[in-house]
Amino acid sequence: MKQNKRLMVMAGGTGGHVFPGLAVAKQLQEQGWEIRWLGTADRMEADLVPKHGIEIDFIKVKGLRGQGVKRLLAAPFQIINAIMQARAHMKRWQPDAVLGMGGYVSGPGGIAAWLSGIPVVLHEQNAVAGLTNQWLSKIAKKVFQAFPGAFPSAAVVGNPVREDVTQLDEPAQRMQEREGPIRILVMGGSQGARILNQTLPAVMANLGQDYCIRHQAGKGAAQEVQAAYQANNVANAEVTEFIDDVAQAYAWADLLVCRSGALTVSEVSAAGVGAIFIPFMHKDRQQALNADHLVECGAAKMIEQPDLTVESLTQQIQQLDRQALLSMAQKARSAAKLDADKVVAQAIVALTEKR
């Protein structure tokens, strides 16, 4: 017999889906809720979620974009099978609500919850809603969005961001007395970004000793990127595959050069760091739209990928002295929505109290 309320989180594929889900889960765990995850066995959630003390169930589901004719013809059967798998997990565990945070798993999981009479809560992290969330929004009891425009009438709450990021000191406390080389942090998301790996070593060669850099290269790319810095005679570069303590990295940085995935944009704002965004090219300009509000308020700069060259990025960085970077950081922090995890958690609690 159940003692506590239960939430099943549906999120997978990338850190942009998984980390916000973990932030909401933590809020509810602190209120005595039991949390279980629905994911896929071959994506990052399979390794990451159990490290946070949360048990995970798996279903077999893959994306359909870019697939051949045979895969597309088989897709309806695979989706039905995934829905049945998800429904079986829910029948066994009996959650009081499910939270869809995106990734391939959310579609079958959301439909399974709806068929089982379990309320669905959605959170869209990007400025352009994904196809799965567009469908699920029609059956969800509550829909949230991080940025305006994803849905016409959903509440804008920001993205749930990890507590260690939201609790960083204000930019002035961190940056006011800094001396020495300007600190550049490069992050291409949890998967890395090849164009940043290719461009930054030559940029650092142009910038010289007045700058130092920490570079997250992505899985399997650190050795190649380190060699590129060495080939450009850049001594003050630290290269890793993945940065484990992201909050500490934000606190260290004067400037971030990065993609503008939804979670990255929200973390940059919550941490209070000036940024130069290089959006991933996508037909709906999703990443560019994610970053627009920070660019418009003076907290960030943006270079669209077709315009990115060693020269254009070098020039943009050289225009930003420490005072300008502090101003950008303060504007970023002022634009942050720091309570998205609490707002979503409160909505889930309120929804289940009505049942």
Swiss-Prot record:
SUPFAM superfamilies: UDP-Glycosyltransferase/glycogen phosphorylase. Gene3D superfamilies: Glycogen Phosphorylase B. It comes from the Bacteria. Pathway: Cell wall biogenesis; peptidoglycan biosynthesis. It comes from Vibrio parahaemolyticus serotype O3:K6 (strain RIMD 2210633). One of its GO terms (cellular component) is plasma membrane. It is found in: Cell inner membrane. Its main location: membrane. It catalyses: di-trans,octa-cis-undecaprenyl diphospho-N-acetyl-alpha-D-muramoyl-L-alanyl-D-glutamyl-meso-2,6-diaminopimeloyl-D-alanyl-D-alanine + UDP-N-acetyl-alpha-D-glucosamine = di-trans,octa-cis-undecaprenyl diphospho-[N-acetyl-alpha-D-glucosaminyl-(1->4)]-N-acetyl-alpha-D-muramoyl-L-alanyl-D-glutamyl-meso-2,6-diaminopimeloyl-D-alanyl-D-alanine + UDP + H(+). This is UDP-N-acetylglucosamine--N-acetylmuramyl-(pentapeptide) pyrophosphoryl-undecaprenol N-acetylglucosamine transferase. Belongs to the glycosyltransferase 28 family. MurG subfamily. Pfam families: Glyco_tran_28_C, Glyco_transf_28.
